[in-house]
Amino acid sequence: PKFEGTPVAEFESNDRSRVSAFARLYGYESDKHPGMNSLYITIGSEMSPQNNQGFYLDVNESDRTVEIRRQENKTSQRVAYWHFEDLEKELHLKHPATLWVKAESRMNGDIAEFKYTEAELTRSPQFMTFISLIKLGVVTYDWRGYTSKEGKYEGKNHGNAWRVKKKHRNQLFSSSEVIELI
């Protein structure tokens, strides 16, 4: 996301460090990463935010942006955002055609074994449908990482990601084909 004009930009002047700064600014204590600020949350629409930190997604049609907003003390503030055109470009770049695979797994001694049970091939994502699904809370955004509380940024960014609920995947793509697995 972009952070210009947000509290994150005020907190961290270096644009390359702002994803880490976001976790430092809004993260929480976690037993899994002692001494660090963790931020492992799902962010949904205002009606279905899916986290306890006050974050939600808002589609700003007039500015043509999708915003991460933070609700605090009965006020809402934009803390990160994407321009429609950037999101659309990335959506088409990442998912011109995508194979979604479901597998069952088991351990056989030290070796993990997988049995592929389902596959679905989707093509041609529909951007305005993506925007509509954000509004409905069907498309969400996961923030996944942790960082040091101060000083040099240390920790791990697991890569933040957009998610679509499986049962709504066929709405997002103009073509969806289930592939039989033997």
PLM features per residue range, with description:
Residues P1, P7-I182:
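Nucleic-acid endonuclease domains
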